[in-house]
Amino acid sequence: MIWQKPFPDNRITGHYGTLSDYRRKMKMQPHSGTDWAMKAGTPIPAIARGTVVGIFESKILGHVLVQRVQDKNKKIWFIGYCHLHKKPTLKEGDRVGAGETIGLVGNSGSASTGAHLHATLSKTIKGVFGPTSVKFDLYKAIEENK
C-alpha cells in the first residue's frame, strides 16, 4: 500500500494543525488538512490506491471526493480531496490506483486562498468534514506509508 504526495512539498501553503493569524482572528479551529497550491484545473493524482466512497458538495469545502484507502498495516482510512474545480467524473464504487487522476484542482466552496487542493485524513467518511479533533495529519501518514 504505497502512498504518495500529490504535489511537491514546495507547493504546500497550509499544514495540518496550524493556526494562522487569519484563522485566529476569525476564531477558527486549527487547519484540518494539508493544502497544496496549484493552478486551477491541474489534475490531482490519487494519494493511494482505493475506492471512491463519496462525492459531496459542501458550502465550505466545495466539491469533495472521498476515497477509502488502506495503510501499510491494513488499517482503513478516508482521504478527502476538497475544493475541486468541478464535480468529479468518478462515481462511488470506482477503484482508483495511486497516481491516477482523482479530480482537478479548484477553488470551490470557501477556498479563500485561491486554487488549491485541501486534503484531509480521517477514520470515517463524516470525519472528512469534521474538526481537527477527528482528523489526522495526512502529510505525516504519507511519509509513514511510502
Give the location of each predicted region.
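Surface-exposed, glycine-biased beta-strand/turn segments
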Residues: M1-H63, K72, A98, A111
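Acidic, glycine-rich catalytic/binding loops that coordinate metals and/or anionic ligands
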Residues: M1-P8, A37, I76-W77, K91-E100, ...
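Conserved beta-strand positions that form and line the central face of beta-propeller blades
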Residues: D35, V66, G80-H83, L104, ...
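Beta-rich strand-turn-strand
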Residues: L65, P88-G114
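Zn2+-dependent peptidoglycan hydrolase active-site motif and core
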Residues: I47-P88, G114-H116, T120
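Sec/Tat-exported extracytoplasmic proteins
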Residues: A40, F56, P88, V105-G109, ...
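Extended aliphatic helical segments
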Residues: V52-V53, V64-V69, V96, V105, ...
